[in-house]
């Protein structure tokens, strides 16, 4: 996993970590996916940046409901530019 590079990324990751350490244990294991939705968001922010990472994490949270089967759903890798330099 990459590390957050900007102060905004570090703040977002810190807030998610607080959720993981304080709130999540009170709720119990509920996530249908691996990695968990909170870890997915951290990975997405570190890999794609703050805005796209939050977008990807939000899309993932919308899939986390009883009608979705869940399973392994890793963060997509960044796409390479198709233009030649």
UniProtKB/Swiss-Prot annotation:
InterPro entries associated with the record: Membr_insert_effic_factor_YidD
Listed GO CC annotations: plasma membrane
Localization in the cell: Cell inner membrane
Q: Has keyword Ubl conjugation?
A: no
Q: Which UniProt keywords apply?
A: Cell inner membrane, Cell membrane, Membrane
Q: Which NCBIfam families match?
A: membrane protein insertion efficiency factor YidD (TIGR00278)
What does the UniProt function comment say about this protein? Could be involved in insertion of integral membrane proteins into the membrane.
**What is the official name of this protein in its record?**
Putative membrane protein insertion efficiency factor
